Amino acid sequence: MHKKYFIGTSILIAVFVVIFDQVTKYIIATTMKIGDSFEVIPHFLNITSHRNNGAAWGILSGKMTFFFIITIIILIALVYFFIKDAQYNLFMQVAISLLFAGALGNFIDRVLTGEVVDFIDTNIFGYDFPIFNIADSSLTIGVILIIIALLKDTSNKKEKEVK
């Protein structure tokens, strides 16, 4: 018999990501001034103290009410999809847990300080990528996993139709 929900695993992932996100942001906010930076891997990775009161690339800067409302809607939708569409699917449940943790991590920042602490500063193939944080990474990985799960599901359905 297969497990319908992997609640323990999902909660563990979400709690770990949120704690790791908040601890790293706290360390940056309390030990570095905004704009301070140090090189970790030359020409690739810096730790740079930055604040963002918008979304990626500063989109919708200062629109906190919008972010509060949309984040609450997203968190509720993720719980709904977890319950309705991720049954028996550990991979999808992990993806949703990562999305939930990422959204919650940045939501906590916005509620407490009105801005998000960003600090991971990368230069990828000469492109100075926008500074981000652990919550952003969790969101990105969650989206990638959901895309993989959906593509895999579509592929499995096509295989069944052929048989």
Swiss-Prot record:
The lineage of its organism: Bacteria, Bacillati, Bacillota, Bacilli, Bacillales. GO terms for cellular component: plasma membrane. The chain crosses the membrane at residues 11-31, 63-83, 88-108, 131-151. Keywords: Aspartyl protease, Cell membrane, Hydrolase, Membrane, Protease, Transmembrane, Transmembrane helix. GO terms for biological process: proteolysis. It catalyses: Release of signal peptides from bacterial membrane prolipoproteins. Hydrolyzes -Xaa-Yaa-Zaa-|-(S,diacylglyceryl)Cys-, in which Xaa is hydrophobic (preferably Leu), and Yaa (Ala or Ser) and Zaa (Gly or Ala) have small, neutral side chains. Pathway: Protein modification; lipoprotein biosynthesis (signal peptide cleavage). This is Lipoprotein signal peptidase. Its EC number is 3.4.23.36. The active site is at D118, D136.
